[in-house]
Amino acid sequence: MSGEVAQDQPPIRSPRSTRRSQEIVNSAITVQSSAKLDTDKSGAQADKVSSKKSRTTSPELLEDQVVSNESKTSKKKETKASQLFSKRKEIFSTRDLRFLKLRIASPTRIRSWGTHKLPNGKQVGRITKAETINYRTYKPEMDGLFCERAFGPVKDWECHCGRTKGQERNKDGIPIPRVCTHCGVELRDSKIRRHRMGYIELVYPVVHIWYLKSIPSYLGVLLDKPRRELEAITYCTNYASSQDSMAFSASLLFPTTGSFRQSKDSMKWEYLNWFHIETYLGLKEATNSALVHYGKRIQDSPIEVGLPLSEDPRQFSIGAQAIACQLRALNLRSVSRLLSRDLYIIDARETRFGALEEEEMKRRSKLIRRLQLIHYFMQTKAQPEWMVIKALPVLPPDLRPIVQLEGGRFATTDLNDLYRRVLNRNNRFMKLHKMVAPETLIRSEKRLLQEAVDGLFDNGKRGKPVLNSSNRPLKSLADALKGKQGRFRQNLLGKRVDYSGRSVIVVGPKLRLHQCGLPKEMALELFQPLVIRLLLKRKVAPNIRYAKKLMHHAVARGPENPTIIDAVVWDTLAAVVEGYPILLNRAPTLHRLGIQAFEPVLINGRAIQLHPLVCTGFNADFDGDQMGVHIPLSAEARAEAKLLMLASHNLLSPATGQPIVVPSQDMVLGWYYLTTENPWIESTEGLYFSGLSDVEHAYHQGQIHLHSIIWVRWGGESEGSLGDEFEDNPLEIRIDANGHSWHIYSQYQLRYDDEGDLISQFIRTTTGRVVFNQLVHRHIEWSLHDQVMEEIETEFPESVLPPDVMRCLVRLYSAHAIGERPAMLGLASPGTPSPGRACAYPPRDDYADPNQIKEYLNRIGHW
């Protein structure tokens, strides 16, 4: 594939390049102004000299000569500065990119990648030899995989033979391009070997394995043929015909079973004696009739004289060349019109007769897939035959280095072995083709060359991978790109940048939804320039060096036991961090919520604390996952982080629109642990409490355990308290002297007076369930009661189902300002009822007041 880069005008440059360019521009402007001034002076003096019309050397003439020399010098400086500026302007910067377009590369473009024109006019870049370096001189072999003529010199400004060294400059100080007359190597910087490519001209074309073996196979979809048939043609196990014929359809000529087909192929003429006749008398009548019927077709018949003979126009080909011919003969516009017509007929049939059958649906999806692929080729103006490779690009040598080890041995990358494999088979095929070798041998070499290129692109995709001497699969180009250790995720997406950190994430039970716990040591390093600036502003440190020394000592002693000056440093850090958003990212960033903004909360330790509700968006858990921290520097970036990327502003999934902030991870585990029973602890079933608040007091005083089984007086209804099956079958009934009765059940107890009226009831529960119930009632008191439901039904008469109410709230969420959304929805965040307790509950501050909910509902009519 090839990439096309579009650049904006004027280009946006990095700060360093901008400063350098500005310096050059300023120097050019200064030189230009001085030259203009000198030119004016020289013009005035020239007028004086011309008026005198004298050849004598007067002071004015001397002054004129001096000024003119200075003007020439200034013009030279101006020219040099402009050349440097134009040269600097040609330097490519990644910030100049506006977009990147990928498409299939043509053979001509691939050759242009590796072809380079030397100053003497000679073009180099084609690799023809499989050798890497000379093991006697330890220098790269010419025309090999490390050729200095094609990729540039190994040493700066030194040729291959060593006869030409150094760089020559012209009068303006610009290096003169030179080429060694003996070895033909261009003298320049050796860094060019890191980005200069080469190419291999293949004697026989090969099919790109990604387009053949992918799912679905792009070649199969485009040619409308099964992948197995294309693989058989590509790997030279079957021929491709230029046109179909009935002679190739045995089922049409001989519609028989497979067993008879085998007997037909092996039939021979022979005479049977009487013994054979007696033996074959037991054959079934159907078998005899079939043999007689088909025997007439199988018998040889001579050609009658006078019949016209014609040559079969079909042509047979094999290998990638056959695939290329079929792709070249494909008319994309005609095929697109035919496919559109067939698709229109199928859609009309579906509209007229109802649902299509399964076969018609498969055919319809197949037509759509092929039509989309053809449209892609037409839009990108790419040719289908470019999927067959004729020129193979070669990576720069510094990206596949070869290193000398101790003892005279060499270590190299696997790509060099794969390139050597391709070159050896390509050169051998060329020799056999010139020798007019047998067709069988040529066919075998075609298959070997195809397999060598397959191993270079994606080793092991076809089946058995190419192994090295230690039976280890060689690492191909695809292996260097894909996976966690590949070029994209490891070196591009996962590379280290300034003002960033990385650490393990743990749950933060006391955090709010938009907060995260940031270790103090990490925060001090990330915000170091801002902390130093504030220390200097507060006159805590006289200079930058002393401020760094204070910070270093504060980190060395740790934030647990700080001294007075350390406390000043940590207080300064807290002042800097307050209200400053940070970005958290978890790789791989598969969607928008993979990176979100949080307000940092300084904590001790070295792990980042994260809110459990945002784990779904990050697809994170707390089993050792790591996350990266990034600091937005500019005011625009901080504003974007606060207004758009804050976690409390991203409550809905961008893909489905459903809430993505749902309880998970430690929240669910904490609720389960809080409400579970533990029958193995000390029995406390004899304890009775008059209210829920008494249970909480006893728990905080340590009189009962979190999982203790207790009896609590309950004023409301309990589950099953009015059920007939419980009232009819009590475990025990007690009656006191006053006529009061106790009805004891397994989960609750009911007390009645002498008239049968219910006096009180006790339920059997645990301390944790009481705590959980209190938390729910304490922090969700804004729940939709009857009055709020009436208001919803007034505004939405048809909204009587929970999904309708949910859609109403989602619509309400989308209609309001960003800052109002968290308060309006009031989603929970985890916490603990008291320090050291294993419970998760939503803090009260994260919920909206019931009056706010009513106010938002009243504003619905403004839509």
From Swiss-Prot:
Molecular function in Gene Ontology: DNA binding; DNA-directed RNA polymerase activity; magnesium ion binding; zinc ion binding
The answer to whether keyword NADP applies is: no
Q: Where in the cell is it found?
A: Plastid, Chloroplast
Cofactor(s) demanded = Mg(2+); Zn(2+)
Q: Where is this region: Disordered?
A: 1-83
Co-factor remark: Binds 1 Mg(2+) ion per subunit. Binds 1 Zn(2+) ion per subunit.
Annotated residues that bind Zn(2+) are located at C159, C161, C180, C183
KW NAD (keyword) present: no
Q: Which reaction does it catalyse?
A: RNA(n) + a ribonucleoside 5'-triphosphate = RNA(n+1) + diphosphate
An example Gene Ontology CC term for this record: DNA-directed RNA polymerase complex
Q: Where does Mg(2+) bind?
A: D621, D623, D625
According to its UniProt record, the EC number is: 2.7.7.6
Write the record's keywords in alphabetical order, separated by commas: Chloroplast, DNA-directed RNA polymerase, Magnesium, Metal-binding, Nucleotidyltransferase, Plastid, Transcription, Transferase, Zinc
Q: Which domain of life is it from?
A: Eukaryota
Cysteine pairs bridged by disulfides in the record: none
Q: Where is the composition biased (Polar residues)?
A: 23-36
Q: For this chain's UniProt record, which GO biological process terms are given?
A: DNA-templated transcription
Summarizing the function annotation, the protein's role is:
DNA-dependent RNA polymerase catalyzes the transcription of DNA into RNA using the four ribonucleoside triphosphates as substrates.
Give the family per the record: Belongs to the RNA polymerase beta' chain family. RpoC1 subfamily.
Subunit relationships: In plastids the minimal PEP RNA polymerase catalytic core is composed of four subunits: alpha, beta, beta', and beta''. When a (nuclear-encoded) sigma factor is associated with the core the holoenzyme is formed, which can initiate transcription.
Protein name per UniProt: DNA-directed RNA polymerase subunit beta'
Q: Which organism is it from?
A: Nephroselmis olivacea (Green alga)
Taxonomic lineage of the native organism: Eukaryota, Viridiplantae, Chlorophyta, Nephroselmidophyceae, Nephroselmidales
Question: Which gene carries the instructions for this protein?
Answer: rpoC1
